[in-house]
Amino acid sequence: MAVLQPPKTNYGKMKLFINGKWIESSTESYIPVYDPGKGEVIAEMPSATKEEIDEAVEAAYEAFKSWSRLPVPERMQYIFRMKYLLEENKEALARVNTQNHGKTIRESRGDLRRTIENVEAAISALYSLAKGEYQQEIAKDIDEVLTREPVGVFSIITPYNFPIMIPFWFIPYALALGDTLVVKVSPVTPLPMMATMEILANELPPGVLNLIYADDAMSEHLVTHPLVEGTAFVGTSRVGLRVYELSASHGKRFLGGGSASNYAVVMPDADLDRTVSVLRDSKFGNTGQRCL
């Protein structure tokens, strides 16, 4: 079992994770990262340069050539290892999550539980998602065969409110199915995913999973990069629409989730005590940054 250490109080200048290595950015643009509970700057996040974005995408592109050809059971072993490492380090990651985001430690532990469940779901669904179909005599003297193959490099752009959980809505599925990734997280809460990558860094082949930080202009460069096949996005509807427009205009795939605040219909026979408790947590839980 991992020895639990308290989170750092000063992370210094953060690094990019590209092609299996932590790289100090050559950018002159650094963004302060806060511990909102104390109002203190605890890290400086680099906004990657165009050349660094290109390097990350090209690393993922080169890694795809071998990663996509691995048999499904071999890729599955990497995802099993990912699950084990997340479980082994979930308390340490939850503490970094709370430190950088501000949510309660109970909520962060819940985030890690859901993160691990996403990995488990990817493992359980992999063979169904990867297998093709065969239809005999679909028409006279015609049989139909459908195969599913890895697509290529995808970018993942995620918001600040669930810094680890939301990236893992996509990471285990994409990797298990043979694609490679460049992940761009929110500049508000970049530390939890950085801490996660520190745990996973030596467990995947170089270039398969890359982590960068970028401003708006460089994020658009990532989305429209010629070697990127598509983008998975979660964030505000305004930004999501922009990513959708960029993806569509460049002939790329897009999977998006935008802003949401669900309505509640309270029926006359509802248990009001329970209803009010649920609505309160939905509205004010996660420091008021929940979209469910």
Give the positions of each predicted feature.
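Hydrophobic residues in well-ordered beta-strands that form the structural core
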Residues: 183-184, 213, 256
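Conserved small-residue-rich beta-alpha loop and adjacent elements
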Residues: 134-205
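ALDH superfamily catalytic-core signature
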Residues: 238-292
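Short gly/pro/ser/thr-enriched loop/turn and capping motifs at secondary-structure boundaries
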Residues: 188-191, 211, 218, 238-241, ...
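Residue-level signal for inorganic ion chemistry
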Residues: 39, 75, 97, 178, ...
